[in-house]
């Protein structure tokens, strides 16, 4: 099916159904007796019970299984700053995926503000309704402060999926790739092309998982702590990376590298640069819809494993493998935060969905529709909560 066909079908579907979601009651409302229990006068007893003990909201309302999907429409994938109304279909889609893959109810909310303080305060005002907050398509660097402030100030899980979802799945793909190329995580050299929210989150996940040698390349070149003109979020990560203090461009960074991770722009990875990498190079080219290099070009240049963000190529790095199960696990465990330990556990859970004897260079990551993905991720997250409590 062509891209044109998909776009036309998406418009037709949206017009036919008036969006992707509806609200349906769980309880019967067929008689006056039903009405008296579901609404007045019976509902007063439920409200009184929660008033006496606020925690009973998890037991007596939808809070325990409901997540807010919140965006300001400032950084919608492939579309940019399109505003709240235009972002709504994306948030609806996200909410539909939560339900389809993990049974999590979610409400899409788009905010008509791009002011950091206004977003933080609005989410805090809305938080009593929800068991968790999924932030979506909020531009960097504002997204870093918004997420961190909400994590610090709320007692429910807050997760910016654009940062962490893809990073978790890339880490899962890395775990399985290392099994095939027989290299240890602490020995590999990784180049991450893209210094935005996804690139920085991937860097932090890799560091936490044991990767010791990482170089980040942004549009200005290799990030180095010797550069005094870096913005704060780059200066902080530069202290943890580029141990060799390299300077230069992507080609320089890739000399002797084992893994390339691209969250950047179409066509920026040249085939000849792959030839400068170590034996059996691993390429994760995740720019969408056009990757940093197409798989056939990368393989012809000597790549051993290639993953992209696209469903029409092998090894799709798709964050739908992560976020439904992560929230399922966090909600079930009543976690107050989604910690780095929980995120690494999720990556390991995704990786183990493919048995070692089934791993091949074109099969390093499970399909989102593989049965039990969200369940395994949720269990992995839940176990991490137990281990850290």
Tell where the protein language model's regions lie, with residue ranges.
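N-terminal ligand-binding/catalytic initiation module
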Residues: 1-158, 384
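Adenosine-phosphate binding glycine-rich loop
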Residues: 161-162, 285-389
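Solvent-exposed alpha-helices and their adjacent loops that cap or buttress functional pockets
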Residues: 15, 58-63, 99-100, 125-127, ...
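Glycine-rich phosphate/diphosphate-binding loop of Rossmann-like nucleotide-binding domains
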Residues: 77, 82-102, 160, 168-265
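General beta-strand structural signal in soluble alpha/beta enzymes
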Residues: 108, 134-137, 158-161, 192, ...
